[in-house]
Structure formats: structure tokens, C-alpha cells
Amino acid sequence: MQRSILAATALILTLTAPAPTHADPVPVGLDAYAQWDRWPQQRIGVRAYMRSTYDRDGGNRTADASHFLYAERPDFNVALDILGRGVLYFVRTNHWHGSPWHYEIDGTDNLVRETSTVDPERPVRNSTFEPATTFPPPLAWTWSTTRGADLNWVPIPFDRSLRLAYGRTFYGTGYYIYHQFAEGTPISTPLVPFDLTKPPDAKVLDLISRAGTDIAPQDIARHDTKATLTPGEPTTLFDHSAAATIRALKLTIPRDHARELSDARLRVTWDDRPSPSIDAPLALFFGAGLLHNRD
């Protein structure tokens, strides 16, 4: 069965774009957000890690909660312990569990709370992180907005070490993402240890607040195509043979076929390479499980 849609299951791009070199400074900290045009670039010398409170026995005991590395005292239960310089970019906890949290940077303890900490049995509506000016939306959201987790994307730089410890252990879950850097890797700004009194740059907050809006330039070349997809057969939507940068990829599909087209594969190939550099289900490419909009 054929369907006429503004979409494609395969894109073939012959694209020659300037490649980053080792001398290009790696955007770090808030620069990693502000320099959004460099998000797709491969970053040489960056080591990305994810850690959590998972059950080290592999059994998912207590739903991967409260598996701390060690405890120094009743209110200092260490879930993350890093040596060397780097940036902690993401922390997720179930609700406010574990608060107050100790962000120990280069040996200096910084205490971070959530407003439901005072009386955990009676959580606060419209809760926030404390200090609120240091952890504002949209870089930090609490369970009252997310309906399940406290999420923190405020970059936490450290020069020598970082430890994250929980003040309470009840259902102390946690997931953490951080970057470290190989010796000699140039970075965009010195890694000044995190300052609990310093709020994030307002320009970064404004940029992240515009997520989901169209921030692509309006005065650039466009290529519009209407394609008819045949199940099981690739369709070429765009083929370009000169140096260029793709600034936006927009697909419009029929609402009544959104679910089935979620699994259509999107393939993108640069410079006539034998294998595509992108080969993913359409929904996954756009960061969704399904293209179906329940609203």
C-alpha cells in the first residue's frame, strides 16, 4: 500500500563539512549548552560516564535503591565518588529522596535541598531545589513538575574530585552523568570548582526555555519535497553534493499513520560512504517512543 506523505524512509546526503580538530576547544559547563550548534560534533578527549545506585549483585534488589558505595556517617551516604577533573551534568533522584544532598567539590561540601525535605511525609506542592537561584528551571525540575523525579542539569565542575552523598537513605535512588577529559584536551573555559552561590547564566536559561520551538535561521536555503512511501522500499528525499550544514530537518506526516510510521527507518549518508551515519527508527531520531501525540 502506498501513502503520500511529506516524509522519507531514507535520506542520502553528500556533505563535506569542516571537521573538528583536536585543537578545537571542547565546550564544557554552561558552554556545552550555549554552543548548541556544536552539539552534533564528535568531541575528542571527552569521556562520558553514567553511574547509578544499581544493585551490584545484579538482582535489582529494592528496585536499585539505596546501594551506596559507602557511608561515612548517618547523614553522608556516598553514591558517586570521582577523582580527577570533570563536569557533573545530570542528577536524577526519585522524588526528593536522599535530600539533603552533599555535593562535595574538591573537598568542599555544598548542601543542596529540596523543599519537601523538612517534612518528607507531607511533600510540598510546587517544590523547588534550594538554593532556588542556583538550581532554577529549566535546568532543574522537581517531582511536582515531572510527576516522579527530581532532575538537575546544572553543570557541576570539579578540578580534583567530586563526591555526591545522600543525607537520607530511604529509597535512595540516583542516576548520574558526568564528563571527564583526557590529559591535554583543550576546553572552552577553565574548570572553576562549582560555586553554590552563583546562578546559571540567564542566556542559557533562556535558550533551554525555548526547547521545542523553531530556532533555525529563516533566511537559509530550503529544499521541499513531497514523497510517496512504498513499504519495504527506500525513498530518497534529499541529495546534496557540495559543502553545507543541515540546520533543520522537518517532516510532516498524516496523523492517522503516525504510529506505524514511527518505525520507518531514517538513513543519512555523508560523502558517498558505504554505510549510513544515521540509521534509526523515525520516532527514535526525533527523541520519541512513538510519533503519536496523545494530546
Feature roles, as predicted:
Residues M1-S4:
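Positively charged n-region of N-terminal signal peptides that target proteins for export
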Residues D24-D295:
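Beta-strand-centric surfaces of beta-sandwich/beta-rich domains
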Residues A19-H22:
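Sec/Tat signal peptide C-region and signal peptidase I cleavage site
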Residues A7-T16:
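Bacterial N-terminal signal peptides
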